[in-house]
């Protein structure tokens, strides 16, 4: 049944012709929501612009929901939209990163210019304004309907 399949190319079998035409109008070849979603964050939970002069915690109660064969990543970009140079050459955190889950299965990522003293997983941000892009390929249906990315809390 092509309405539930998630294989590569299945988007062309779906019946959402109007939606697919609108996507093609803006960016031919762009992924539809069934294939990928791209949440972006520019502000913390206090509605302040993200700035590497501060330290933040990105807390996932549960890992981003993707289907088998899918993956997720979070990448930090400077306000110039380029990757941020850093001493450990780490530019993103993904489902394939070597992070350590909390006892309850949640994940905490420290966003800051300097390595955290508590040993938590660190995504370097530089010491200027930055933003985050999350990519979820083959997101689980609940991601499309109910899941909200976590807020970013200043420490």
Q: How should these model regions be labeled?
A:
Residues 1-12:
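Single conserved hydrophobic/aromatic residue that forms the stacking wall/gate
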Residues 10-133, 137:
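Extended, compositionally biased non-globular segments
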Residues 139-155:
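Exposed low-complexity, polar/acidic, P/S/T/G-rich flexible segments that act as propeptides
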């Amino acid at each position: 049944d092509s309405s539930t399949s998630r294989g590569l190319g299945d988007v062309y079998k779906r019946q959402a012709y109007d939606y697919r035409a609108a996507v093609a109008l803006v960016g031919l070849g762009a992924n539809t929501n069934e294939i990928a979603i791209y949440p972006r964050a520019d502000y913390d939970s206090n509605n302040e612009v993200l700035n590497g002069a501060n330290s933040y915690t990105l807390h996932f109660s549960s890992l981003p929901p993707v289907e088998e064969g899918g993956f997720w990543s979070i990448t930090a970009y400077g306000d110039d939209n380029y990757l941020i140079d850093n001493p450990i050459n780490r530019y993103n955190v993904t489902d394939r990163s070597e992070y350590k889950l909390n006892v309850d299965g949640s994940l905490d990522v420290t966003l800051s210019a300097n390595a955290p003293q508590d040993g938590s997983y660190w995504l370097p941000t530089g010491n200027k304004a930055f933003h985050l892009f999350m990519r979820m390929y083959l997101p689980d249906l609940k991601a499309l309907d109910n899941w909200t990315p976590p807020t970013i809390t200043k420490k």
